[in-house]
Each structure stands twice: as C-alpha cells, then as structure tokens.
Amino acid sequence: MEPNGYRKERRKEQHLGRMNGGGGDVETDLDPWTAWAYKPRTISLLLIGACFLIWASGALDPDSTTSDDLVTSVKRGVWAMIAVFLAYSLLQAPSTVLIRPHPAIWRLVHGMAVIYLVALTFLLFQRRDDARQFMKFLHPDLGIELPEKSYGADCRIYVPDHPTNRFKNLYDTVFDEFFLAHIFGWWGKAILIRNQPLLWVLSIGFELLEVTFRHMLPNFNECWWDSIVLDILICNWFGIWAGMYTVRYFDGKTYEWVGISRQPNIIGKVKRTLGQFTPAHWDKDEWHPLQGPWRFIQVLTLCIIFLTVELNTFFLKFSLWIPPRNPVILYRLILWWLIAIPTTREYNSYLQDRKPVKKVGAFCWLSLGICIVELLICIKFGSGLYPTEMPLWVVTLWGSVGLGLVAFLLSWTWKIQKILAQKRR
C-alpha cells in the first residue's frame, strides 16, 4: 500500500504526463535508465543521512571531534542544521509546477529559499555593526568598509590629457563587472517574464530608479551615455534580445521526448541527457496588463517586486560593506534566479486561473517574504548612512506619477462600469 503523499504525487505526475502528450501511467512511461530516480526512497535516504551525521558529529567517539574553538564548533553545527533541513526539503517539501530536471531539484530550491528567509530574519534583529561583522562568517574578506565607486565623476568620453588611454572613462565602464552583469541579468529576466514590452518597462524603470537614488548610492551616479547608451540601448537590449530569442526557440520546438536508453547512439544519449535540463513543455506566459484595471495592478505589482529586489542588491551591498566582486553577491543573485523561475510560473498560473477562490503558490509567498525582509534590512541598516535629502524635483516627479496612475485607474474603472451599465439596460 502506498503512502498517501506518494499517491498524491503519482496522481500529479500522471496528470503532468498527460499534459505533455502521454496518456499512460508515469511509471510505465519512464525510461528504465532513470526510473530509479523517481521512486521514493525516503526511509533509505534517512538512514544514510543518519549514518553521515554519526560520522560528522562524532556521536560514537566524542573525543575525536572535541574542539577547543567554539566558533568552529558553532559553524559546523549551523552547517549541519542547514544540511538536515535541505535533505528534508529534497525529500518531503511540496512539489512545484516544474518537473525538469527533476522535481526534487525544485524542492531543494524551496528549502534554500526558506533558509535564506530565516537567515535574513536573524540578520534583521542585529545591530548594523554586528551584522557587518557577522558577514565575515560567510566570507573572510567581508566586514571591512570599502569605498564605493562613482561612475559619474568624469563624464568625458574622450580625455585628451590622459597619458595612456584617451578613452579611459569609456574603457573602464565597458570592462566593469556590471557590464556583463547587465547582459546576463536581462537574458535571465527575459526567460522568466517572456514578454518584451514588460521587459522594457522594467529596463527603463530601473534606470529611472538609479536617477532617483543616485544621491544615496555612489554606484547610481552614472554619466548620461553610460545610463542611456551602454545600459539601456546596448547591454539591456542585447540581454533582452538574447533572452527572447531563447524563448522563441523553445516556443517553436516540438517536444517529443524519448528515453535515454532508447537513443540509437552515444551522441543521442548525450543530447537527451542534456535535454533533461530544458523544459518538458514550453508554456506561454500571457500577462495581458491591459485586460482590465485589476490585471494592470497585478502586473504592476510584479514589476514593483522585480525592481525592489534589484534595488535591494545595491542597498544591501552598501550597508553591509560587500564589494561588487565578492562571491556572496553572485550567490544571492543565483539563488534569486532559481527562486524566480517557479515564482514567475506560479504567479502567471495564478493570474490565468479562473477560479473565484484561489491563492498564490508557496514560491510566490516566499519570494514576497524575502523581498520584504531584505527591504526592512536596507531601511534599518541604512538609517544615518544617507545624509543627503532626496531632491525636490524627484519627489515632485514621483508624486505626479503616482497621482496620474491613480487618476488613470479610476478613469479606466469608471469607463468599464459605464459600459457594463449600458449593457444591462
């Protein structure tokens, strides 16, 4: 007799199998070479994990693992806690709508998101100086104040008096780490959102936010040609183009999956193995922001959250003294990208669901929670770090945008209600 959770999982996998073009039981459709990976072995893995804990903790030989260094013992204990929780998530966390390369991968990402949320909550309750020193436990180079680079100190493209390179300013900007970060970042966002107008709204919106907060962060103080030409027209455009090209490639592809063991040669087996890391089927994310006022607000909320997560990167980096090239920045971005993949799918499914009563998925909840706690950390640790007040013209501009948006939504709603009233007559 199967456990109740496994029966539910099998029914879900069978439903997904039928959606992908298969009509039979998933177990019969699985390739013999990979069928073992889809069979539950939770008890076996629990016992293996227990054996690993016995070895790592020295439970049977306490003297061999005794350490006089309290910090080392605490570090090992914390990493063991994280490993146990991730193992639980890998085996027992709720599955998502994604099944490639394996549902367990996304359960593991779910566990990583929970750990990140809990760690951020712990950091939120610390003092700013203590939090900065705490970052040393993540990387030994952290906890040291570093000067922030300003890109708008000299906006000349051609510097005739420079001794070695007359295009020094342009050279330094192009070969800065943020140049490639823009390209790969927008390629990843295009794969997530799959809507070119929405991507351009985000691209231009973030540049406007850089102008808004450049009095607070030196990184945002950019030259006009850096912000408009290099960022928007070159880096962001190329990243969006490459991402949408990837989207169109998978959208036009015919998905007829054949098992690895049934491939005729080694090349076919290698291609099929690599294909396991691509989507099982490609769904179009239809956002339709102009479908109605409420849908417009829902899509606008998605844009605001995306932009807030991006802003949090720079404010966290500034307040916690994390240099741009430190791997902690890269780890956070990779984790956020992994979290955003199922989050975007869940949110789009939520918008397209016609049920009167519905709720967002677990990843949507986690993403919003992480975004909020990151923002609270930026606000708390940023207190007193930004002595320059926001310019009056910036406040006036965004106030006007907010009032205009409210007026637009009210007018739109009034017109719809007027049309519906006429139809009832």
From Swiss-Prot:
A GO CC term assigned to this protein in UniProt: nuclear membrane
User: Which terms does the record give in the GO molecular function aspect?
Assistant: CDP-diacylglycerol-serine O-phosphatidyltransferase activity; L-serine-phosphatidylethanolamine phosphatidyltransferase activity
Q: Where, subcellularly, is it found?
A: Endoplasmic reticulum membrane; Nucleus envelope
Give the membrane topology.
Answer: Multi-pass membrane protein
Q: What happens when the gene is disrupted?
A: Mostly embryonic lethality with low frequencies of dwarf infertile plants.
Regions of compositional bias (Basic and acidic residues) in chain numbering: 1-16
GO BP of this protein: microsporogenesis; phosphatidylethanolamine biosynthetic process; phosphatidylserine biosynthetic process
Annotated metabolic or biological route of this protein: Phospholipid metabolism; phosphatidylethanolamine biosynthesis; phosphatidylethanolamine from CDP-diacylglycerol: step 1/2
Q: Please tell me which top-level EC class this enzyme sits in.
A: transferase
Paired cysteines (S-S): none
Q: Where are the transmembrane segments?
A: 42-62, 79-99, 105-125, 197-217, 227-247, 296-316, 321-341, 361-381, 390-410
Known InterPro entries for this protein? Answer: PSS
UniProt function note: Catalyzes a base-exchange reaction in which the polar head group of phosphatidylethanolamine (PE) or phosphatidylcholine (PC) is replaced by L-serine. Is essential for phosphatidylserine (PS) biosynthesis and PE seems to be the most plausible substrate. Plays an important role in microspore maturation.
- Identify the PANTHER family for this entry: PHOSPHATIDYLINOSITOL SYNTHASE (PTHR15362), PHOSPHATIDYLSERINE SYNTHASE 2 (PTHR15362:SF7)
Homology family: Belongs to the CDP-alcohol phosphatidyltransferase class-I family.
Q: What is this protein called?
A: CDP-diacylglycerol--serine O-phosphatidyltransferase 1
The species this protein belongs to is Arabidopsis thaliana
Its gene name is PSS1
